[in-house]
From Swiss-Prot:
It is found in: Nucleus. Binds 2 magnesium or manganese ions per subunit. Mn(2+) 1 binds at D295, G296. PANTHER family: PROTEIN PHOSPHATASE 2C (PTHR13832), PROTEIN PHOSPHATASE 2C 29 (PTHR13832:SF301). One of its GO terms (cellular component) is plasma membrane. Expressed in roots, leaves, stems, inflorescences, flowers and developing vascular tissue. This is Protein phosphatase 2C 29. The lineage of its organism: Eukaryota, Viridiplantae, Streptophyta, Embryophyta, Tracheophyta. PROSITE patterns: PPM_2. Its EC number is 3.1.3.16. It catalyses: O-phospho-L-seryl-[protein] + H2O = L-seryl-[protein] + phosphate; O-phospho-L-threonyl-[protein] + H2O = L-threonyl-[protein] + phosphate. Residues 562-580 have a biased composition (Basic and acidic residues).
Length: 783
């Protein structure tokens, strides 16, 4: 999670670990550091990633991206912050968020397979009827991987070279340092919004958008450290997906995802490990977080579909609860009106000059140009002007001669006309008119000259209501919904989004049933946590869990006994004994102190979710009551002998008879009746955070194969706030799995994917630091 770079340097020298334990080792040379990145990193094991909100107090210590652009290259120097990035205490945009940082880690055991159905273009749109134009229809990468915006930092998990059982992030041993690495000195942040370095692959339209913004950032931050570009500590974007072909990498529709939020402050991340998927969406300005863990089974299509569509469906349902559209001002300001009027007058003059059959003299044209440019200077316009406007504002003598060699022409006729013109001014006005008319033609249909800047597609049609809408894209900004929130409506919105998403998935399964009947076998458990301020909304299906680590008062027998003795002593002092002098009590006597001793506190794990599996007697009873005619609905502690979970997303072969009948006989069940054997009805819960809550743990069921709730919280606390808690929990999981199998830690990791599923399941862990806790040092804070 990005510890200070000065504390990471000793960990590079892997050949002298024993010597470093007894004496401080010298810092390795720069060439040695570069050589440590020569070997490509294996991404099949998993990833470690973190997120730190850009709204955190940056005066405590610099962010990694800012720390390496200081003039003195000092890693501890707090750089001058960008204007507008720091919100004052009285700013209306400064919001209180219930979380401080996110630590995540994923480890895979199953083989990562490609999706069965690759094209889902119009299915989700028909099911959800979303006003945002459908869901994010594509996935993240072709294999185990992680992708996110600049506020997220990630690197693949690697075992230590000395077979010590400790993780590494790349060439750095993760047992000594936690979290992803920081960029090197002189490396300029490529983020234009969050100010945190980027260490995951980024492609598609979003990558082009960020590269265009890079020029602006270069103008503000000079490069220090020589002309030669230093190799970044994190892997380059092109080499992040090791061994993957570029054409096989499928990127998420980031523009559509950003459009659903309506703001540029959306920070997102998508990751996969085996059949597990993780999705994070953070709205920094609106102050809420969406975190989803999707634990798939029998194939990747169900969790992929959830990762592509569930967030957008829930976000659409939350309109009016968490966010709302800003109404456009119907009465523009006087300045804007004057600008439009002056531009209209200027265009009229240009048209008159271009269509005039009697060319004016150079002196008259110069005077006219002065009058036009002086009229435009009445109001200072900060907006960028068109090319023909800038050229027309220049003086005739100082302006660029557009016809010096008669080469500047839009056509052959223009060149001939310019050559026959009487004066240089006439040539210039003729060409400016052509340029202006050319730009005007682009705006006839109401679309801009560069449609890719605004995401306008050619196949979009203009809607009837044009208020704030251009080419089918709603230009109104989305803002945080003020006022109190009805928690029941929020939970209902989450449930509606899930219902619409599953309906779309089952419809897709039915459409491709003849060609891909195996899609009916695929399903997924899911866990979604929605946080807004101090309110947490949990939705789960299956056996994934959400825990809250909190301190509670531990009432021991000793503390109760001490309180009773104090009360008895006070009663004795209050008795009036006339035969004796009043008793003088020393205030230093702790036994009669008015204040009782502070109670002892203990860390407990509060489970916010409900398990849906055959291990829960209520779930088994429910299924048997729903299928009284089927005596074999639960076989071998599984639903129809197939699934351990009693509720799941997808898995249509246990929900619809026609989907079950399409399967091969070896996979087909004896379906009695038409009622589904498993449901997609989620468990919903609202929880209000308190000052005693330290962090929240979200994880798939693979974690609880070897760890209990209390052990998970205790392990996370060992590396909290000074380490990487999520990765520490994952490491302990693998250690216990290896110990149970009677093998070494590295022997377990040497087992290829697929075969390793015999010893442990795919596992994804998210540790969310809450507002009442300290943020861990490895996330870029020096406390």
């Amino acid at each position: 999670m990005g510890s200070g770079f000065s504390s990471l340097l000793p960990c590079f020298n892997q050949g002298h670990r024993n010597r470093r334990r007894h004496s401080s080792a010298a810092n390795p040379s720069h060439s040695d550091l570069i050589d440590s990145f020569r070997e490509p990193l294996d991404e099949t094991l998993g990833h470690s990633y973190c997120y730190v909100p850009s709204s955190s107090n940056r005066f405590i210590s610099p962010f990694p991206s800012d720390r390496f652009v200081s003039p003195t290259a000092s890693f501890r120097l707090s750089p001058p912050h960008e204007p507008g990035r720091i919100r004052g205490s009285g700013s209306s945009e400064q919001l209180h968020t219930g979380f401080r940082a996110i630590s995540g880690a994923s480890v895979s055991a199953n083989t990562s397979n490609s999706k069965t159905v690759l094209q889902l273009e119009d299915i989700y749109d028909d099911a959800t009827e979303s006003s945002f134009g459908g869901g994010v229809r594509r996935s993240v990468v072709n294999a185990n991987g992680f992708e996110g915006t600049s506020s997220f930092s990630a690197l693949p998990l690697q075992p230590g070279p000395d077979r010590s059982g400790l993780f590494m992030s790349g060439p750095i041993e993760r047992g000594a340092t936690s979290g992803p690495l920081d960029p090197p000195a002189g490396e300029i942040s490529r983020s234009n919004s969050a100010g945190v370095h980027f260490s995951a692959p980024l492609g598609g339209v979003y990558s082009k958008k960020r590269r265009k913004k890079k020029k602006k950032s270069l103008s503000w931050h000079p490069i220090f450290g020589g002309e030669k570009k230093q190799r970044p500590w994190v892997l380059p974007v092109s080499n992040f997906v090791v061994g993957a072909k570029k054409e096989n990498i499928v990127r998420p529709d980031v523009e559509a995802m950003a459009a659903s939020s309506g703001e540029n402050d959306l920070q997102w991340a998508l990751g996969k490990a085996g059949e597990d998927r993780v999705q994070l969406a953070v709205f920094e300005k609106q102050g809420w977080l969406f975190a989803g863990i999707y634990d798939g089974f029998n194939g990747p299509d169900a969790p992929e579909f959830l990762m592509a569509n569930l967030y957008r469906a829930v976000h659409s349902e939350l309109q009016g609860l968490f966010w709302e559209l800003e109404e456009e001002d119907d009465n523009p300001t006087d300045i804007s009106t004057r600008e439009l009027e002056q531009q209209g007058e200027f265009e009229d003059h240009v048209n008159e000059m271009a269509s005039s059959s009697c060319p004016a003299t150079e002196k008259e044209e110069e005077e006219m140009g002065k009058r036009l440019t002086s009229s435009l200077e009445v109001v200072e316009v900060k907006e960028r002007k068109r090319l023909w406007e800038l050229l027309a504002e220049a003086q005739a003598e100082d302006a660029l001669d557009l016809s010096g060699s008669d080469r500047f022409a839009f056509s052959v006729d223009d060149a001939i006309g310019a050559g026959n013109a009487v004066s240089v001014g006439s040539k210039r006005w003729l060409l400016l008119s052509k340029l202006k008319q050319g730009l005007s033609k682009q705006g006839i249909s109401g679309r801009k000259l560069f449609p890719w800047k605004s995401g306008v597609e050619e196949n979009e049609t203009e809607e009837v209501d044009n208020v704030g809408v251009e080419e089918g894209v709603d230009k109104r900004r989305k803002r945080r919904k003020a006022g109190t929130v009805d928690h029941e409506l929020v939970l209902k919105a989450m449930s509606n989004g899930l219902e619409a998403t599953e309906q779309a998935f089952l419809e897709m399964t039915d459409k491709v049933l003849e060609t891909n009947p195996e899609l009916a076998l695929m399903g997924s458990c899911l866990l979604v946590a929605l946080m807004r301020d101090d309110d947490v909304y949990i939705m789960n299906i299956g056996d994934s869990r959400a825990l809250v680590a909190q301190y509670q008062v531990e009432e021991t027998g000793e503390s109760v006994e001490t309180a009773e003795r104090v009360e008895e002593r006070r009663n004795d002092l209050d008795r009036d004994d006339g035969n004796k002098e009043p008793l003088v009590v020393d205030s230093s006597d702790s036994t009669v102190n008015n204040e009782a001793p502070l109670p002892q506190t203990k860390l407990v794990a509060l489970q916010l979710t409900t398990d849906h599996s055959t291990s829960i007697e209520d779930e088994v009873t429910r299924i048997k009551n729903e299928h009284p005619d089927d005596n074999h609905c639960i076989v071998n502690d599984r639903v129809k002998g197939r699934l351990k979970v009693t509720r799941a997303f997808g898995a249509g072969f246990l929900k619809q008879p026609k989907l079950n009948d399409a399967l091969l006989e070896m996979f087909r069940n004896e379906y009695i009746g038409t009622d589904p054997y498993i449901s997609c009805t989620p468990s919903l819960r609202h929880y209000r955070l308190t000052e005693n809550d330290q962090f929240m743990v979200l994880s798939s069921d693979g974690l609880y194969q070897y760890l209990s709730n209390v052990e998970v919280v205790s392990l996370a606390m060992e590396k909290f706030p000074d380490g990487d808690p999520a990765q520490h929990v994952i490491q302990e999981l693998l250690v216990r799995a290896a110990k149970k199998a009677g093998m070494d830690f590295h022997e377990l990791l040497d087992i290829p994917q697929g075969d390793r599923r015999k010893y442990h399941d795919d596992c994804t862990v998210l540790v969310i630091a809450l507002g009442g806790s300290r943020i861990w040092k490895s996330s870029g804070k020096y406390l």
